[in-house]
């Protein structure tokens, strides 16, 4: 049992150690490829990836080399990691439960409304300093350049990303006739300038939040899978820690201060039975 549980914890920690590498790689990739340069998802992902890497390494060393203190540190950190990841996952599910696009009659793409999203997300994109950094990133990614050459027919037949729908065109309800603007606040914010467009529109902020919402939903699924794995590893770690201490102190005093003998392992009886049978045959 001692060797079995320590082997299991060693293998599981090796798997989580290897799994932390793509987690870190995914966070770095999304930080570079994200249209909005949104980093409040990538930062927790990076931190979690590095913590899993370090904790798994400590658990692997403790289980394979019978280092009791390494396993003790591993178990303490692991329980905090599980609690943190569980809290982050629940928070993500709550703040992404609201939102989604609105169908536009006669169009394939959807449009997005800022009021449909969770208040925590809305307050975040309304912060001027924070929004300016996202706006600069959208400009540098040339997201709107990709639809500059679209014809009127393209707007009826082709789909858009949430950022393109909110930031690169005025809302479909807007009308601009004879110098009169009608259709709501975003219609007045629209500007034909390449660096202006609808970047200050609420629809643009909503489009960014929709991209974040979808990314966070995917991250929550990954977090749940990682949580299941970490809980399994933690349970095996508790067994390995118990066995490591038992290996260091194989005999324990009883209440009357007498030493009790440890019973032979179950596989010893099978080995003796097989050895006797083999001697009878030969």
Curated annotation (Swiss-Prot):
Domain of life: Eukaryota
Membrane topology, Cytoplasmic segments: 1-7, 66-74, 242-282
Subcellular locations according to the entry: Membrane
Annotated transmembrane regions: 8-28, 45-65, 75-95, 221-241
Extracellular side: 29-44, 96-220
Keywords: Membrane, Transmembrane, Transmembrane helix
Stored InterPro entries: TET_plant, Tetraspanin/Peripherin
Record's bilayer topology term: Multi-pass membrane protein
GO CC field: membrane
Gene Ontology BP, a term: auxin-activated signaling pathway
Main location: membrane
Role played: May be involved in the regulation of cell differentiation.
PANTHER family with a match to the protein in the record: TETRASPANIN-8-RELATED
Stated family: Belongs to the tetraspanin (TM4SF) family.
Name of protein: Tetraspanin-6
Lineage: Eukaryota, Viridiplantae, Streptophyta, Embryophyta, Tracheophyta
């Amino acid at each position: 049992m001692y060797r079995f549980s320590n082997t299991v914890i060693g293998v599981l920690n090796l798997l989580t150690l290897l799994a932390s590498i793509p987690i870190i790689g995914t966070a770095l990739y999304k930080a570079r490829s994200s249209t909005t340069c949104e980093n409040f998802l990538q930062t927790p992902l990076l931190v979690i990836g590095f913590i899993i890497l370090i904790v798994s390494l400590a658990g692997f060393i403790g289980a394979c080399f019978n280092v009791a203190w390494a396993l003790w540190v591993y178990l303490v950190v692991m329980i905090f990691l599980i609690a943190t990841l569980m809290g982050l996952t629940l928070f993500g599910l709550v703040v992404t439960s609201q939102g989604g696009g609105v169908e536009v009659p006669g169009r394939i793409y959807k449009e997005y409304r800022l009021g449909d999203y969770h208040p925590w997300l809305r307050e975040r994109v309304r912060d001027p300093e924070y929004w300016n950094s996202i706006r600069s990133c959208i400009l540098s990614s040339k997201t709107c350049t990709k639809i500059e050459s679209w014809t009127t027919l393209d707007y009826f037949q082709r789909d858009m990303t949430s950022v393109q729908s909110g930031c690169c065109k005025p809302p479909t309800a807007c009308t601009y006739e004879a110098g009169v603007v009608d259709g709501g606040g975003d219609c007045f914010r629209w500007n034909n300038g390449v660096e202006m467009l609808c970047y200050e529109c609420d629809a643009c902020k909503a489009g960014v939040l929709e991209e974040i919402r979808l990314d966070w939903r995917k991250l929550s699924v990954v977090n749940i899978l990682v949580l299941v794995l970490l809980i399994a590893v933690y349970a095996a770690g508790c067994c390995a820690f118990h066995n490591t201490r038992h290996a260091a102190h194989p005999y324990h005093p009883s209440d009357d201060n007498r030493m009790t003998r440890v019973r032979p392992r179950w596989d010893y009886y099978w080995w003796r039975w097989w050895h006797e049978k083999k001697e009878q045959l030969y």
